[in-house]
């Protein structure tokens, strides 16, 4: 189904008892201006523009880059979508504006250092540390283009639509027949025929066909050579001078490729990320922040998902996904507890460990040491089973800690939910 494929483009979700919650994947997401610079290196047509982090830099950019432009596009730079319809906490409406050149400096001053709230940031919003000043393009057509990874074809999948400029979900609903999918053979790479199919699906009105084919091939080259997990151009614009231009782009990169993409990963802006996820990544923990009240620490992704489901079934809401893995050290367990207790929304913590490679006594020692370092103000429910379970239970019993023990997962979830509402 088209919608199923499109759902993989920009985000995924955790299914918790039949309800979907946002999941931030372990991947690098870079700012729009950084993506434009990267695309330019591959010969991809992008608008002329420059980023500025202060009013003085804005003034210099207007003078040196846009000395004769009458209108300028001023774009707030945050790692979230929906900027155009967002609202600054200062009251300014919209994170993207087209203004007269002489007004750009004063507008940028109202954006820089302010918090922008969009449908993707949550009510806390994100701080705007830079603005991206771009030339105003004369557009004759807007299209949609994306490359993502498809499990069904076990390779890159190009998705294109002759309509663009709005969310792909809306496009899929309004114009399902206009969306095409072109799977690419990962061994052969993109061929002229593949690129031609994409161009035919985009149906540009005036752009040169061969030049358009070359642009598609360059986008695919960027996707592969940069280890992207997503390259989304919306809109892929057709300009009055008969060119295809990546007017707005979103690029995500596989975290597993950090060792060979050092230049790209140096672009990471941790100020835009959840500080809990940043701390977890440093400790080599698989953590994803959610918006519930029960903190979870589990070993194994499957068990973690099941734990979240059962919490939901008992009427609770998980505050996070946290998989400590099968070889976590005592220090990592301590760090995990620090992350869980740093969330003010957490009213109870559920530790659910099935010891295979992960030993229950290591988890127990970590819990005890964490209690010594962290002021535990919320109830902790512990369910241990598996390797060294007796040693683990003994360590917890002899610690003198006030813990709520559970015999199985269902019992643990029920007790955690009850503890969270006291």
UniProtKB/Swiss-Prot annotation:
Main location: mitochondrion
UniProt-listed GO biological process terms: succinyl-CoA metabolic process; tricarboxylic acid cycle
Protein name: Succinate--CoA ligase [ADP-forming] subunit beta, mitochondrial
Subunit record text: Heterodimer of an alpha and a beta subunit.
Residues of the signal peptide: none
Top class in the EC scheme: ligase
SUPFAM superfamilies xref list: Glutathione synthetase ATP-binding domain-like, Succinyl-CoA synthetase domains
Catalytic reactions on record: succinate + ATP + CoA = succinyl-CoA + ADP + phosphate
GO MF annotation terms: ATP binding; magnesium ion binding; succinate-CoA ligase (ADP-forming) activity
Gene3D superfamilies the UniProt entry points to: ATP-grasp fold, A domain (3.30.1490.20), ATP-grasp fold, B domain (3.30.470.20), Succinyl-CoA synthetase domains (3.40.50.261)
Residue stretches making up the ATP-grasp domain: 36-279
Annotated S-S bridges: none
Cellular component, GO annotation: mitochondrion; succinate-CoA ligase complex
Entry's localization field: Mitochondrion
PANTHER family (alphabetical): SUCCINATE--COA LIGASE [GDP-FORMING] SUBUNIT BETA, MITOCHONDRIAL, SUCCINYL-COA SYNTHETASE BETA CHAIN
InterPro entries assigned: ATP-grasp (IPR011761), ATP-grasp_succ-CoA_synth-type (IPR013650), ATP_grasp_subdomain_1 (IPR013815), Succ-CoA_synthase_bsu_CS (IPR017866), SUCC_ACL_C (IPR005811), Succ_CoA_ligase-like_bsu (IPR005809), Succinyl-CoA_synth-like (IPR016102)
Cofactor note as given: Binds 1 Mg(2+) ion per subunit.
EC number of this enzyme: 6.2.1.5
Transit peptide (first-last residue): 1-27
Pathways involved: Carbohydrate metabolism; tricarboxylic acid cycle; succinate from succinyl-CoA (ligase route): step 1/1
Chain sites annotated for binding ATP: 75, 82-84, 142
Binding of substrate, residues: 299, 356-358
Positions with a binding annotation for Mg(2+): 234, 248
Function: Succinyl-CoA synthetase functions in the citric acid cycle (TCA), coupling the hydrolysis of succinyl-CoA to the synthesis of ATP and thus represents the only step of substrate-level phosphorylation in the TCA. The beta subunit provides nucleotide specificity of the enzyme and binds the substrate succinate, while the binding sites for coenzyme A and phosphate are found in the alpha subunit.
């Amino acid at each position: 189904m088209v919608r199923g494929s499109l759902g993989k483009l920009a985000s995924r979700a955790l299914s918790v008892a039949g309800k979907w919650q946002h999941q931030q994947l372990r991947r690098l997401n870079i700012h729009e201006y950084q993506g434009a610079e990267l695309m330019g290196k591959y010969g991809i047509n992008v608008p002329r523009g420059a980023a500025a982090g202060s009013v003085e830099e804005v003034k210099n950019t207007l003078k040196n880059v846009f000395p004769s432009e009458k209108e300028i596009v001023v774009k707030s730079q945050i790692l979230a979508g929906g900027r155009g319809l967002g609202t600054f906490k200062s009251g300014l409406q919209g994170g993207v504006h087209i203004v007269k050149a002489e007004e750009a400096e004063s507008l940028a001053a109202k954006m820089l250092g302010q918090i922008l709230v969009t449908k993707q940031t949550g009510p806390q919003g994100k701080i705007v540390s830079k603005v991206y000043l771009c030339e105003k393009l004369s557009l004759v057509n807007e299209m949609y283009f994306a490359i993502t990874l498809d499990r069904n074809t076990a390779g890159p999948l190009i998705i294109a639509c002759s309509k663009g400029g709005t969310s792909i979900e809306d496009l899929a609903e309004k114009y399902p027949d206009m969306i095409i999918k072109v799977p690419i053979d990962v061994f052969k790479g993109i061929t002229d025929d593949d690129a031609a199919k994409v161009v035919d699906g985009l149906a540009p009105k005036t752009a040169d066909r061969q030049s358009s084919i070359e642009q598609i091939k360059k986008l695919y080259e960027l996707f592969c050579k940069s280890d992207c997990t997503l390259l989304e151009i919306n809109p892929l614009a057709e300009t009055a001078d008969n060119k295809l231009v990546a007017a707005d782009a979103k690029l995500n990169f596989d975290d597993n490729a950090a060792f060979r993409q050092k230049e790209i990963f140096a672009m990471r802006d941790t100020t835009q990320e959840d500080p809990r996820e940043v701390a977890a990544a440093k400790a080599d923990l698989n953590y994803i922040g959610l918006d519930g009240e029960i903190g979870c620490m589990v070993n194994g992704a499957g068990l973690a998902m099941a734990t979240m489901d059962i919490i939901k079934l008992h009427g609770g809401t998980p505050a996070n996904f946290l998989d400590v893995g099968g070889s976590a050290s005592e220090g990592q367990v301590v760090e995990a507890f620090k992350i869980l207790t740093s969330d003010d929304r957490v009213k109870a913590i559920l530790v659910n460990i099935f010891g295979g490679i992960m030993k229950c006594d290591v988890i127990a020692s970590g819990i005890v040491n964490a209690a010594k370092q962290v002021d535990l103000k919320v109830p902790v429910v512990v369910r241990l089973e598996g390797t060294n379970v007796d040693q683990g239970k003994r360590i917890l019993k002899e610690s003198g800690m006030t813990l709520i023990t559970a015999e199985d997962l269902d019992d643990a979830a029920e007790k955690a939910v009850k503890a969270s509402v006291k």
